Every structure is written in C-alpha cells, then in structure tokens.
Amino acid sequence: PDGRDPTAFPFAKVDYEETIKGKPTKQKIGFIRNIGFGPTPDQEVLKLCEVAVKVFEQMGNEIQDVVPPFNNGDLIQAENFYQTRTLAELDLLSSENREKAEVINNWADEAKHYSGVDHYRDYLGTQDLRSRMFRAMDGYDFLLLPTVPFPPFAAENPGLDDGDIFSPWCNTFVFNLTQQPALSMPCGKTSLGLPVGLQIVGRAQDDIGVLKMAKAYED
C-alpha cells in the first residue's frame, strides 16, 4: 500500500497461484442480462453469455436473473459527471499533451456549460448509482453480465459508430464507483468472429473469490 492513499488496504501476503486452486464452493450468483442503461444488449452477445452462465450452473452454483437496477436517465447523469471531472483533469496538462487527446477533449468540452450545482447534482447521482448497485447485489455472492453488451465497434473508432464514446463503459464503470473486484472472461465469438466477454463481479475486497470463479470457468 501507498501511505499517501488513505483508501489503500493493508498488505496481504497471498500466494494467488495456490490460493485460487480447487473448485469453489456452491455460490449464489445473479445474472444481469440488461443493466438498464446504454444501448439495447445485442442478442448474439446475450446468447454467448447465457451459454457461459450455464457453465457456472453446471458447477453447482445457484443462478438467478437480476432485475435491471438502472434506467437511461442514470447514464446521462453519470456521463455528465465524468465529463466535468475529465475537463478538470485535462486542465492540469500542458497544451502539448492535451492536444494529443482530441477525442477526449471534444467529449469533455461539453462540461464547460455545466454549473457547479450541476456537477454536484451529478456527483450525488453517481453515489445513488453506487447504492443501487449494492442493493442489486444484496443476497448474491457474485454477479455475471456481459462485459460490453454489444459486439466490438470498428477498430478505428473511439466509440460506437454514431460517435457515442461513453456507452461502451455502461456495464463496467459502475463497479469503479462501488470499488468491487471484477474481471472479464472470453466467452466466445460472434458470427463475424468478434470477441465477447463475460464479466464476473464479486463483493467488495473478494478479489480471490472472483479469481477462483474465473479459474473454475476457465478449467
């Protein structure tokens, strides 16, 4: 841990390679097909994730569907918050370095029109997302959901083909807010050969549990 970081956890001497060996005990797992905001999940992506979830069920885990915890208005508020934060962080860079991030600059520039009250309202919105995500996980040991709910966009694009660069994060950014451990496992390819990932999310500080579940799936 870094002494300058008050959120850092104490050092834990763990041999992860040894610790994650062995089949995990039966767990209660929630499956989120649609988190509630962002683009409508692609059916081909969902089918691949459903096949992967069956593997966890065959291991003896209890699988339950989770009702979408969010709605599209939540995503707008979250994006506004991150635009404002990014704008402030970009202001710390030299003009030379800032010019290297044209896409992010253009995206964050929208926040120049937001007021201080707007920003704090958006901040409170992200805290509400955090609370609702914890409530959605209540009673589950792990959550499973598509890492990205649609196939990869064109490699030369910074985001979706319509210019939306925030929606690709819709299934992942909330776990930065909650500080839950999460990882993405490959779970197949679309008919066009594009990779699809299944995200495994654990309870706060249960990094080992997430790694165990991932290894069990991989094996």
Residue positions per predicted region:
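Short, surface-exposed loop/helix-turn segments at secondary-structure junctions
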Residues: A8, Q77, Y82, R121, ...
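Short connector loops at secondary-structure junctions
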Residues: N61-A78, N106-E110
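Structural helix-boundary/capping segments
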Residues: P1-I32, G38-P39, C49-M59, Y120, ...
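Acyltransferase
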Residues: P41-V67, L90-E96, H119, Y123-Y140
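Short helix-loop capping/hinge segments that flank enzyme active sites or metal/cofactor-binding pockets
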Residues: K21-R33, N80-F134, S184-P195
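Short glycine-/acidic-enriched loop or helix-start segments at secondary-structure transitions
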Residues: P41, L75, F153-E156, L194
